[in-house]
Amino acid sequence: MHSFEISIPDSGLETALQNKIDRKTKPLGALGLLEKTAKKIGLVQQTLTPQLNNPQMLVFAGDHGAAKAGVSAYPQDVTWQMVENFLAGGAAINVFARQNGLGLSVVDAGVAHDFGQRTGLIDAKVAAGTANYIEQAAMTPAQCAQAIQNGAAIVRQLAAKGCNVVGFGEMGIGNTASASLLTHCLTGLPLAECVGRGTGLDDAGLARKQDLLEQALIRYRNAGGNNDAGAVLAEFGGFEIATMVGAMLAAAEAKMVLLIDGFIVGSAALIASRLAPALLDYCVFCHRSAEAGHRTQLLAMGAEPLLDLGLRLGEGTGAALAYPLVQSAVSFLNEMASFESAGVSDKE
């Protein structure tokens, strides 16, 4: 697997950051998770006065061979149709990114459609969708490696343009099924507790999805498959998930703040953090999704999400919605008065 130089942020500033937070005109801990977020960002940037510069949202899109087997309520064509919707500015992520001042790019990591050259679209296509993992590995090791390299290159270009905070989103019919398999393999949670309704499967559809995923697992185990993060990514992942893994690793290497969305983005973060555990020190977990298995993902990563809105859309919507809270964490640290500067008496 690839080599990324990801170091745990130097904790030398931690006491000074905590003291700065504690001297603000408020009771200790009164800003809750915003205080932890402010401290995390200060440590990532190694400063008492962090800044969020050129914030960008990346939406990674890819098709899944297993979608044709019936793991989703929607036809595979919806992937490319939604990419067109993103490019036209009409999706939920477009609305929230515009509202909150986030730049937005769509990454074609492996959609089964030819988009040509388009403004706002990054061509990082490994292939026109993965293979059907119910019958064979979703991708070859070489394809998986290529996707990771592609993602890293995209983020390095953003870093060169002064971006120090990046949000992750995705689109791919069938990718909740893929994320369910990855979550099961990496956390040990029973598959049934990792499999949800995705885009809205009825009871029969949910049972069929679970049965198909059990078949995929049996095939993999019978072939001697293990739970190594890189191996399960190639076996069950999507090109959008693998490309996202590379992007996350490069973002942490560049000491950027990573805005982690929901269940599918969470599966990429789970993989990336198994490959480089220090990555978690750079992640802000934006929300707890309504999708089955996301709670276990968050527990496995020791994550405290900022929001719990019952979201299950994907696209990076939870990350975009949480971004103003991240801004608020930085703003209170930089702008709020201390007891001393405001002439306010602290408690006895």
Curated annotation (Swiss-Prot):
Active site: 315
The entry's keywords: Cobalamin biosynthesis, Glycosyltransferase, Transferase
Role this protein plays: Catalyzes the synthesis of alpha-ribazole-5'-phosphate from nicotinate mononucleotide (NAMN) and 5,6-dimethylbenzimidazole (DMB).
Taxonomic superkingdom: Bacteria
Record field: catalytic activity: 5,6-dimethylbenzimidazole + nicotinate beta-D-ribonucleotide = alpha-ribazole 5'-phosphate + nicotinate + H(+)
One Pfam assignment: DBI_PRT
GO molecular function, one term: nicotinate-nucleotide-dimethylbenzimidazole phosphoribosyltransferase activity
Enzyme Commission code(s) on record: 2.4.2.21
Protein name: Nicotinate-nucleotide--dimethylbenzimidazole phosphoribosyltransferase
